[in-house]
C-alpha cells in the first residue's frame, strides 16, 4: 500500500467484531512501532500486548460510561490491546552519557525536558502502529490509559509510564456510526489555515 493511501484511510474505529487478528500481523505492527524515532537512541518505549478476554474486560471497565449511554464497549471488543509504555529514566540516563552534549552535572528536567522526549517518542510509535494497522487491513484506535490501574494489572514496573492503548481488531459494520455518535465528524482544516511560512500569520 502507498504511504499516502494509508494516511488517508486511517480512522479511529470504535466498534469491533470478534474476529481475531492474526498474530503475524500484530508482530509486524509492533515491529513498525519500535522503528520510530527515538531521542539519542534511548529506546525507552516498550509495549505490553494483551489478548486475554478477562484482562481486556478489566482494562475496559473504566469505559462503562459508553455502555450506559447505549454505545458498545469498543475497548473490550478489540481483541488486541497494545499498552504503550515509556520510561523517563531511560532517557535521563542516556542524556547523562558522555557522547551527549547535555551531559552536565547540574541539569534538571526543567532546563532540558520542556517537551519530554519520552512522550514524543511514544507518540511517534503510536502513530506508526496506527498506520501499520491500515497496511495490514486491521482496524485500530488509540485510547488514553488509567496508568495506576494498568501498572498494577499488568505488572508494569514503577519506572514506566503507560501512556495509552492501541486497540487492534476488525471493524464492525456499525463502526462509522458509533464513531460519529461519540465525536461529531468535522472536515479537516485546510492546509492554508494550519501552515505558517516564515512567521505566524493571522
Can you say where each PLM-predicted feature lies in the sequence?
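Small-aliphatic-rich amphipathic alpha-helix that forms the alpha element of a beta-alpha
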Residues: 29, 33-34, 82, 102-153
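Glycine/small-residue-rich phosphate/adenosyl-binding loop
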Residues: 42-122
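Residue-level "edge-of-site" marker
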Residues: 46, 146, 164
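A short N-terminal beta-strand-loop micro-motif at the entrance of redox/enzyme domains
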Residues: 13-28
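A glycine-rich helix N-cap at a beta->alpha junction
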Residues: 68-81, 156-178
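C-terminal helix-cap and adjacent tail motif
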Residues: 3-13, 88-90, 164-202
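Short secondary-structure capping/turn segments at boundaries of alpha-helices and beta-strands
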Residues: 31-37, 67-71
Amino acid at each position: 500500500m502507498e504511504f499516502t493511501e494509508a494516511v488517508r484511510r486511517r480512522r479511529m474505529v470504535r466498534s469491533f467484531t470478534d474476529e481475531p487478528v492474526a498474530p503475524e500481523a500484530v508482530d509486524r505492527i509492533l515491529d513498525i512501532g519500535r522503528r520510530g524515532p527515538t531521542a539519542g537512541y534511548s529506546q525507552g518505549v516498550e509495549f505490553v500486548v494483551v489478548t486475554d478476554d478477562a484482562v481486556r474486560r478489566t482494562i475496559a471497565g473504566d469505559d462503562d460510561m459508553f455502555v450506559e449511554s447505549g454505545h458498545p464497549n469498543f475497548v473490550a471488543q478489540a481483541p488486541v490491546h497494545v499498552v504503550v509504555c515509556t520510561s523517563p529514566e531511560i532517557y535521563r540516563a542516556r542524556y547523562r552519557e558522555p557522547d551527549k552534549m547535555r551531559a552536565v552535572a547540574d541539569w534538571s528536567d526543567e532546563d532540558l525536558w520542556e517537551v519530554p522526549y519520552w512522550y514524543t517518542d511514544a507518540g511517534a510509535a503510536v502513530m506508526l502502529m496506527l498506520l501499520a494497522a491500515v497496511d495490514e487491513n486491521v482496524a485500530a484506535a488509540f485510547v488514553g490509559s488509567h496508568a495506576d490501574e494498568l501498572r498494577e494489572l499488568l505488572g508494569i514496573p514503577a519506572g514506566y509510564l503507560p501512556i495509552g492503548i492501541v486497540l487492534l481488531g476488525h471493524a464492525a459494520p456499525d463502526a462509522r456510526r458509533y464513531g460519529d455518535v461519540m465525536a461529531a465528524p468535522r472536515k479537516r482544516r485546510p492546509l492554508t489555515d494550519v501552515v505558517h511560512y516564515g512567521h505566524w500569520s493571522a
